[in-house]
A protein has these predicted regions:
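Residue-level preference for long, well-ordered alpha-helices that form the structural scaffold
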Residues: 112, 177, 181, 240, ...
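Active-site neighborhood of glycoside hydrolase catalytic domains
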Residues: 212-218, 222-333, 338-351
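Acidic, contiguous N-terminal accessory segments
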Residues: 1-98, 316-325, 329, 457-464, ...
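Flexible loop/turn segments at secondary-structure boundaries
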Residues: 110-112, 138-144, 206-212, 265, ...
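Feature activates predominantly on carbohydrate-active enzymes
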Residues: 7-11, 30-263, 304, 308, ...
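Flexible, acidic glycine-rich loops studded with aromatic residues
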Residues: 315-323, 328-333, 337-506
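Generic secondary-structure signature for well-ordered alpha-helical cores
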Residues: 193-194, 253-260, 307, 311-314, ...
Length: 506
């Protein structure tokens, strides 16, 4: 099973099962997300799951589904019907972390609603409970905002798309885009909630905003731009005028009205300051505010957005660059620590709650091997075993600091994932390994060898669920993208680069 339960006590014999879901009960003395799955070990021989809440029951049912033959996971047909023989056993289980997340970038490549719902369903099957939805970026905008209609008329489409990770003149000469209606996103929220997944929207600001500036040039610093067609980080950022701050608040209001969860992402990452340094208006604002430099202005902006979300009864969630704001960084902001391992430690030591999602362990756009047929290889090699070895809580923290690490998250950046099929390939089976890390490895069965043995069995479940996962033997010839060149790096080079980047946190 994946994730492996904490305790399995096996009995003698088998239970004859005719229904795919057991009887369910709530016992509030259990952990809220914990459960006990009793498969025929009690005197009455009944299969039952007892959870600390409806969440616990749901996770117990997911475990029970893995006790049935993989064919039972198919949607219909005689192969999906019982009866089945299941070994007698008693399983006791509960997660290690409250936040077990996966981030999906739908800005770089738009994912149609049915594919997005399927992505959620697969995450829930693996007991993940947060979908961080990256809705906006330089290359596309997916969130409707009534007061700013051009966002879903102009900002949601780019004229063409760069092929590969190397900057060159090779493009797919076809427009790409789309957006979700309010009804679409409400369906996403409802669908996820039934599977005990909270959707956390992210609207990246004040950088990663070229698509919005293409739709409303007055938000920028004077340059006339189109929605970005190449990959990378745009130097075109928001200008931080009063009108632009109002735009940002309107966008957060729109997210608040659709997504009921506690957190709303504001990004805060990778914001070049070139335009701010050259802008008389921005420099005048800095002077009025008494701020010494552009980094301080960035921190002030983050504080403005966090204050607005707090007024709505929500908490801001952002990338670890936000920590560079120092004392200006709002104490209640949740940090997504991505630039290597160190930012998780820094955030916790400074008293911030933090979600560990370091690129070197949890970025699923990174290539899966050195094989020449890996599609558009970027980043360092990140194998299934590398993901499984990830420890979200860094060494060297006190007990109180360790508690600040509320969970872990895998990030699926889609610059080079043009379809749901490609997302499957890059996500699975590595997300299976990550799910077990986030749920908490069983002390008795947490070895790489044990996990790999279970993963070989688990691939039959992925087959039944229709997942286009990367084969354990390696990429197949049809997985290659010779038309879309990658930009691979060694792990040493990546770590060195991140060490340079996080100098702003020291």
């Amino acid at each position: 099973m994946i994730p492996q339960p904490k305790s399995i006590i096996r009995g003698n014999g088998f239970v004859h099962v005719t229904e795919p879901e057991p009887a369910s009960f709530i016992d509030a003395s259990l952990p809220r997300e914990g459960y006990v799955l009793d498969v025929g070990s009690s005197e009455d021989g009944v299969v039952r799951v007892t959870g600390g809440s409806s969440e616990g029951i749901f996770y117990g049912v997911q475990t029970f589904r893995q006790l049935l033959p993989p064919k039972s996971l198919r949607h219909s047909g005689s192969a999906s019907e019982g009866p089945w023989q299941v070994p007698v056993q008693r399983i006791t289980d509960a997660p290690r972390f409250a936040w077990r997340g996966v981030m999906l970038d739908v800005a770089r490549h738009f994912m149609p609603l049915p594919d997005l719902l399927r992505f959620i369903d697969l995450a829930a099957f693996h007991k993940l409970n947060v979908l961080h939805l990256h809705l906006t970026d330089d290359q596309g905008w997916r969130l409707p905002v009534d007061k700013w209609p051009h966002l879903t008329e102009v900002a949601c489409w780019r004229k063409r798309t760069m092929l590969g990770a190397v900057h060159h003149d090779k493009y797919e000469e076809r427009p790409h885009g789309g957006f979700y209606s309010k009804q679409d996103l409400q369906e996403v929220v409802s669908f996820a909630a039934k599977r005990h997944i909270t959707v956390v929207p992210e609207i990246d600001m004040p950088g990663h905003m070229q698509a919005a500036i293409a739709a409303y040039p007055e938000l920028g610093n004077g340059a006339r731009v189109d929605v970005m067609e190449a990959w990378g980080i745009s130097t075109h950022v928001l200008n931080l005028s009063d009108k632009t701050l109002g735009f940002c608040r309107d966008v957060l209001d729109a997210a608040h009205d659709i997504f009921p969860g506690q957190y709303i992402g504001i990004g805060g990452d990778e914001c070049p300051h070139d335009e701010w340094k050259a802008s008389p208006d921005v420099q005048a604002r800095m002077k009025r505010l008494g701020l010494p430099n552009e980094s301080s202005l960035h921190g002030w902006f983050v504080g403005q957005m966090a204050d607005h979300l707090r007024s709505l009864g929500r908490r801001a969630y952002g990338w670890d660059e936000i920590l560079a704001g120092g004392e200006r960084t709002p104490a209640d902001i949740l940090i997504a620590a991505w630039r290597g391992i160190e930012p998780t430690k820094i955030a916790a030591q400074r008293g911030f709650e933090v979600v560990a999602c370091p690129d070197v362990a949890a970025y699923l756009d990174f290539r899966q091997s050195e094989d020449k047929d890996e599609p558009t290889p970027v980043g360092t090699v990140l194998t299934v075993n590398d993901v499984y070895a990830f420890e979200p809580v860094p060494a060297g923290l006190t007990e109180d600091e360790r508690k600040k690490v509320i969970g872990a998250q895998a990030n699926v950046w889609t610059e080079h994932m043009e379809s749901a099929r490609r997302v499957d390939y890059m996500t699975y089976p590595r997300l299976c390994a990550f799910a077990e890390v986030a749920w908490g490895k069983s002390p008795d069965e947490s070895s790489i060898e044990n996990f790999n043995d279970r993963l070989k069995i688990h691939t039959a479940r992925l087959d039944a669920l229709g997942v286009n996962y990367r084969q354990l033997s390696g990429p197949q010839p049809w997985d290659a993208r010779p038309d879309a060149l990658g930009k691979p790096k060694t792990k040493e080079a990546r770590i060195a680069k991140q060490a340079k980047f996080i100098a702003d946190l020291q």
